[in-house]
């Protein structure tokens, strides 16, 4: 008899789902994205993360990964860095379509619009793989119903590391579900820090000097009108949080919505 369970796209293992990998794309030596089948019962809010991983010798090796796909997608997408000696990514980097990845059952996180007060403009500030939750959010029709404008910034060391977000934003233009809503309302700004280019500099510096706002032709951050989501390195999170609080922004949470939110539990360096 055929083992239909092993042939299934998703196997329910109790604490986790074993989901079949459907697609893998490598952008640089350090960055890649992959898609898996999605469990029919798995629901999440755009911007949340899940524990994902691989089977280990004694127990699964798991890390928190933001879901990069929108909530309406019938697959799950994740965006990952490759760390040579990372407990998970040193193996995850070699996955191929047909392999299985463990996916947790309980999405959570603070990078959700529920944790923000109503506002006019939503800023999504990211570095590196911190772009992942925003990849989900900018593909959600509801985000464009909540905010007049969405500003998505992505800062990396070099231009090739921006390929994921650039391709994503370009594909949105012809997306049948959100393309029309995003047109003229989604503002994408990228910058690099370790090479010359048309836009260079850390996002914290670009905000502090006002160059970001000059480039996108928008006023400086204002807690009366703007809401901010932040995902990236710990140093970037801490610096931006300090900058925002100095400007009168209050940090929000699922329990008490505010003017800005940060996410610290994402798949970053050393995983």
Please tell me what each predicted stretch does.
Residues 122-125, 229:
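Conserved beta-strand elements of the Class I
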Residues 2-99:
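Ferredoxin-reductase
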Residues 127-133:
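Ser/Thr-glycine-rich phosphate-binding loops at phosphate-binding pockets of nucleotides
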Residues 116-121, 223-224:
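Short helix-loop-beta connector
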Residues 2-6, 11-17, 153-154, 158-271:
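Reductase modules of NAD(P)H-dependent flavoproteins
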Residues 107-117:
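A short, basic/flexible loop-to-alpha-helix module at the beginning of a structural domain
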Residues 47, 130, 233:
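Short, conserved phosphate/pyrophosphate- and ester-handling motifs at nucleotide-, phospho-/glycolipid
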